[in-house]
């Protein structure tokens, strides 16, 4: 089977332009998911390491990545990607006024590396039907005060 990303075409409205017709956009449609066990099996077929050993390493990798992010370290997974914690929140007038309680969100920034960039560069696409149709929300009439 040729490798391709499946997509469907879906209507989207611009919420700031009420009353205008929707425009149509591509939306990726997943074919399924790949678990750690699935990845271990795939990796086993490309090398001499047994599936259970690969799985054990992948599970340990989860723990090591989480611990490194908790320590404020940047996680570089070779040419695959880089992971780093970022923060956002409210500002203070002065540095002295700043308190940790002003931090409102913690996120993991994902930056794809060369391997993923190259994978995206060579994508093929196959159009499919919409998998999960989102029901159009009915607009409620404005209530007068």
Per-range role (PLM):
Residues 1-56, 63-145:
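Strongly charged
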């Amino acid at each position: 089977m040729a490798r391709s990303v499946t997509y469907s075409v879906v209507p989207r409205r611009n919420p700031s332009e009420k009353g205008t017709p929707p425009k149509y956009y591509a939306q990726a449609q997943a074919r399924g998911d790949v678990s750690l066990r699935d990845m271990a099996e795939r990796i086993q077929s490309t090398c001499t390491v047994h599936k259970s050993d690969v799985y054990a390493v992948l599970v340990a990798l989860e723990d090591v990545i989480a611990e490194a992010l908790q320590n404020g370290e940047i996680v570089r997974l070779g040419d695959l990607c880089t992971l780093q914690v970022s923060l956002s929140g409210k500002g203070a007038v002065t540095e002295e006024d700043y308190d940790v309680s002003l931090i409102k969100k913690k996120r993991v920034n994902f930056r794809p590396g060369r391997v993923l960039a190259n994978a995206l560069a060579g994508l093929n696409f196959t159009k499919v039907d919409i998998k999960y149709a989102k029901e159009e929300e009915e607009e409620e009439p404005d209530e007068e005060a």
